[in-house]
């Protein structure tokens, strides 16, 4: 019976479920009813489970204890007799012994214990004095608020209050700053909205909301119609001048007011008893940009860009700050009103197809901008027949003196007097990049022109064939230090400055001392070439017997990854050497039954060393045979939290990843050593 009771308590408390199993709980109650001894044993088992450092075990144990507390007077007496320890294990009243993880389950345990103790006090407090004293101690000494749903302790409530006060102070400061900013920017917002509304009225001179059919164009009076009207627009007029234009779209006159029937007939209306709503499509409201309205559209786009990038985000942030603060009612209403007006302006701009986008195609440049661009850069056609450099045969005609590379001082003195005379200002012309003298100097090198290479004499056919054969047979090696110092008898050795004194400020003069190194000199004269040998294909096979009765056909050079070292075997797969046969017999005797060949510990260790993956060779049970968890339903406290940092660390610090990094760093060191091996300071270290 005791064994059955222990198993039931362990299964109930280590299941990890939020609710207890009703069937097992019924069996536990039945055993506890049998005798007081079993009830006391159950109490000690539950208190032992409450002492476990796992919040899920404590929560399940408390749920079992709560049900038994409500059914047995003897059990209530046992719990109340050790009530202080019970409070420490369920409520965490001792700050030196806090509730164990997981944190969420510990919070649920505290809430459940608080509600249960309050119910116990209301129901059994009069009969159990120690229970009433414990409730009074929690309420007045430990400051436990039994009305608090979260069942927080005094320290937790103080921390929450301090956090809330700090947030309120931050929100208040931000709200005051937002109120000052809104007062400063209100004028700018109103001005921007007024400017944008004026642009909309200039582009669309009627209001669609008030009178959908009131779009009329002002037409000149009849007396002025015959006169010529000045017009500077290159676009078509908005309203065509035709004989019926005055009657169809002109402003209402006094005759129409006196004759309402004529007004109805002229407009095609049957009567005045109904109204007509004209719906305009969005395509008909799009503003087309031309030369007349380009400046207005550009101003509207600038205002819309300002609203979209600065004013509307500021208004949204004001609304958010005032909403969080909750104490700036008037400012909140003003911010909401400004936000609504800005959003309405953006909506109307989208209806008119005026979008504040950068580099919009189709923008017509203003005339002033075109003039400025033309003033800055003027395209000049290139002069016909222009040559940047004067040819050699035309330089005497241009008055320039031609000096050959072999002419000396005598020839220069023997020149005619007209050419020997030096013109005034010729030195200044040489520095002027636009002068002919400077153009003569800059394309030519400072030294004498190099003579063209002399053509090589053609070789005889026999010599050419021999030379081609020798070139084909000669090895091609990359250029190195040995080729750089090829044929030099004396090499420049490295110099090291030696200073014998180590005083801080009194020093002797530095003396250059030449240190010769035999290894450096040898490296400068010779080259090390690695000879890998000639590839020889593998002719033999593994020929080890496989479980299916066939022989292994792998052609590895030294060692088979499945059967180990390759040894000579006969056609049946038996080793030819007696030592190999004896060794295989010993391995078969030592191999446990039921384990395949690929789980051999020696083979697994070789594979682990090659791949860097743990295959379980160090464990006694092989791969996947590690120690299993005793209670799989509980949360594993030793498991690392599944966070982004943990996942990245698992990938970065994996054994295979570390091995790859080590290999790459070793290769970098080898390349660096090969690159700087011929330098004396690296060679001497």
From Swiss-Prot:
Biased segments, Pro residues type: 445-458
PROSITE patterns per the UniProt record, alphabetical: ZF_UVSSA (PS52058)
Cross-link position per record: Glycyl lysine isopeptide (Lys-Gly) (interchain with G-Cter in ubiquitin): 383
Pfam families: DUF2043 (PF09740), UVSSA_N (PF20867)
GO biological process: protein ubiquitination; response to UV; transcription-coupled nucleotide-excision repair
Basic residues bias: start-end ranges: 622-632
Record field: compositional bias (Acidic residues): 368-379
ZnF (UVSSA-type) ranges: 539-566
PTM description: Monoubiquitinated at Lys-383 in response to transcription stress; this promotes efficient transfer of TFIIH to stalled RNA polymerase II.
Region feature Disordered, mapped onto this chain: 243-267, 353-466, 563-636
Keywords noted in UniProt: Chromosome, Coiled coil, DNA damage, DNA repair, Isopeptide bond, Metal-binding, Phosphoprotein, Ubl conjugation, Zinc, Zinc-finger
Entry-annotated residues carrying Phosphoserine: 253
Basic and acidic residues compositional bias, start-end: 380-403, 567-586
Gene3D superfamilies membership: 1.25.40.90
Coiled-coil regions listed in the entry: 153-198
GO CC annotations on file: chromosome; nucleus; site of DNA damage
Subcellular location: Chromosome
GO molecular function: chromatin-protein adaptor activity; RNA polymerase II complex binding; RNA polymerase inhibitor activity
Region spans: VHS-like: 2-145
Family: Belongs to the UVSSA family.
Protein name stated in the entry: UV-stimulated scaffold protein A
Organism this protein belongs to: Bos taurus
Taxon lineage: Eukaryota, Metazoa, Chordata, Craniata, Vertebrata
Gene name as annotated: UVSSA
């Amino acid at each position: 019976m005791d064994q059955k009771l222990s198993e039931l308590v362990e299964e109930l408390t280590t299941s990890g479920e939020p609710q207890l199993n009703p069937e097992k709980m019924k069996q536990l109650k039945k055993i506890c009813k049998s005798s007081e001894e079993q009830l006391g044993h159950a109490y000690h088992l539950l208190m032992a489970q409450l002492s476990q450092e796992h919040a899920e075990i404590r929560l399940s144990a408390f749920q079992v204890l709560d049900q038994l507390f409500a059914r047995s007077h003897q059990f209530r007496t046992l719990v109340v007799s050790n009530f202080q320890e019970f409070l420490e294990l369920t409520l965490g009243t001792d700050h030196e012994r806090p509730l164990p993880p997981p944190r969420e389950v510990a919070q649920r345990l505290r809430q459940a214990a608080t509600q249960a103790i309050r119910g116990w006090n209301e129901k059994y407090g009069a009969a159990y004095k120690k229970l009433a004293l414990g409730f009074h101690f929690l309420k007045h000494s430990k400051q436990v608020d039994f009305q608090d749903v979260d069942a927080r302790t005094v320290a937790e409530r103080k921390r929450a209050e301090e956090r809330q006060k700090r947030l309120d102070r931050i929100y208040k400061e931000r709200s005051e700053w937002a109120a000052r900013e809104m007062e400063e920017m209100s004028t700018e917002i109103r001005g921007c909205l007024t400017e944008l509304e004026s642009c909309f009225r200039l582009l669309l001179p009627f209001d669609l909301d008030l009178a959908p059919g009131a779009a009329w164009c002002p037409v000149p009076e009849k007396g002025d119609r015959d006169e010529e009207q000045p017009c500077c627009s290159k676009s078509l007029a908005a309203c065509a001048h035709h004989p019926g234009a005055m009657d169809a779209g002109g402003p209402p006159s006094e005759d129409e007011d006196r004759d309402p029937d004529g007004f109805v007939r002229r407009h095609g209306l049957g009567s005045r008893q109904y109204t007509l709503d004209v719906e305009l499509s969005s395509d008909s409201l799009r503003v087309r940009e031309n030369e007349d309205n380009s400046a207005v559209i550009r101003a509207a786009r600038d205002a819309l860009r300002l609203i979209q990038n600065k004013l509307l985000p500021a208004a949204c942030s004001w609304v958010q700050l005032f909403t969080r603060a909750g104490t700036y009612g008037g400012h909140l209403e003003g911010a909401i009103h400004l936000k609504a007006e800005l959003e309405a302006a953006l909506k109307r701009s989208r209806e008119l197809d005026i979008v504040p986008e950068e580099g919009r195609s189709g923008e017509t440049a203003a005339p002033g901008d075109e003039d400025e661009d033309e003033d800055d850069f003027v395209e000049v056609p290139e002069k016909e027949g222009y040559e940047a450099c004067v040819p050699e045969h035309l330089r005497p005609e241009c008055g320039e003196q031609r000096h050959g590379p072999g002419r000396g001082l005598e020839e220069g003195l023997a020149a005619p007097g007209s050419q020997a005379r030096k013109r005034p200002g010729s030195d200044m012309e040489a520095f002027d990049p636009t002068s002919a003298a400077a153009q003569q100097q800059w394309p030519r090198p400072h030294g004498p022109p190099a003579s063209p290479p002399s053509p090589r004499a053609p070789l005889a056919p026999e010599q050419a064939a021999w030379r081609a054969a020798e070139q084909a047979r000669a090895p091609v090696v990359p250029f190195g230090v040995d080729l750089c110092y090829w044929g030099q008898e004396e090499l420049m050795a490295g110099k090291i400055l030696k200073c014998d004194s180590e005083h801080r400020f009194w020093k002797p003069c530095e003396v250059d001392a030449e240190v010769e190194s035999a290894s450096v000199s040898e490296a400068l004269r010779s080259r090390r070439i690695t000879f890998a040998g000639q590839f020889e294909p593998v002719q033999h096979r593994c020929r080890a017997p496989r479980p299916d009765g066939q022989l292994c056909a792998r052609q590895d050079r030294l060692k088979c990854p499945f059967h180990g070292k390759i040894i000579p075997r006969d056609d049946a797969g038996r080793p030819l050497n007696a030592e190999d046969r004896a060794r295989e017999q010993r391995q078969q005797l030592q191999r446990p039954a039921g384990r395949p060949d690929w789980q051999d510990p020696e083979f697994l260790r070789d594979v682990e060393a090659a791949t860097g993956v743990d295959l379980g060779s160090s464990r006694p049970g092989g791969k996947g045979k590690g120690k299993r968890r005793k209670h799989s339903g509980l949360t594993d406290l030793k498991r690392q939290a599944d966070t982004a940092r943990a996942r990245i660390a698992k990938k970065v610090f994996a054994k295979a990843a570390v091995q790859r990094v080590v290999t790459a760093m070793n290769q970098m060191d080898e390349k660096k050593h090969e690159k700087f091996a011929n330098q004396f300071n690296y060679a001497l270290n």
